[in-house]
Design a protein with these regions (language model features):
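Sec-dependent N-terminal signal peptides
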Residues: 3-14
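A short gly/proline-enriched turn/hairpin at secondary-structure junctions
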Residues: 46-61, 76
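Short beta-strand edge/turn micro-motifs at domain boundaries
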Residues: 114-143
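Surface-exposed, charged secondary-structure patches
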Residues: 67-110
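A mature extracytoplasmic/lumenal domain signature
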Residues: 46, 56-57, 100-104, 119, ...
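Short, low-complexity N-terminal intrinsically disordered segments enriched in polar/charged residues
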Residues: 12-39, 44
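Hydrophobic pocket/interface hotspot
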Residues: 30, 42, 50, 98, ...
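Beta-strand elements of well-folded, non-transmembrane domains
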Residues: 35, 104-106, 123
Length: 143
């Protein structure tokens, strides 16, 4: 029975991911890179400069990797993040906006925080790149 449940879950996840637009898939990949703490892949998946509007403050970094401190996140208890909602707001040939609701979890799978972020993506060099994030509330990147 457990095997059947696992197979159905995997099929469900596979079916859901195939329904996503290319910008939504780009955001999923970004979360995979973030969870892997892969700064190089995060930089490659984002436009330069990267801006974040967070708690009413506008912050700009040359590269996404300059914005995040995984050591600081881990010291706050962060172990990984998980997307709950991935909604395409807008897409044209050059830009897209994706509305994300996600949670950060600790190593015991307890929710640390839940946030809503709208990401702006740009289409450059044949790929969707994360350019800006608009946070509804306050979201730490470990700094």
């Amino acid at each position: 029975m457990k095997t059947l449940s696992l197979i159905l879950l995997l099929l469900s996840l596979s079916a859901n991911s195939s329904d996503l637009s290319a910008p939504q898939v780009a955001i999923q990949k970004y979360f995979e890179y973030f969870n892997a703490k892969d700064i190089d892949s995060l930089n490659n998946a984002s436009g330069q400069p990267f801006t974040l509007i967070n708690g009413g403050r506008i912050i700009k970094w040359n590269k996404y990797g300059d914005s995040v401190d995984f050591g600081g996140l881990e010291s706050s208890g962060w172990a990984y993040s998980r997307i709950h909602q991935n909604e395409l707001v807008y897409e044209d040939d050059m830009t897209a906006m994706v509305n994300i609701n996600f949670s950060r979890y600790d190593s015991a799978d307890a929710v640390i925080s839940t946030s809503d972020v709208i990401y702006l993506l740009v289409y450059r060099d044949g790929a969707w790149k994360l350019k800006s994030g608009f946070v509804n509330g306050n979201l730490t990147l470990g700094k």
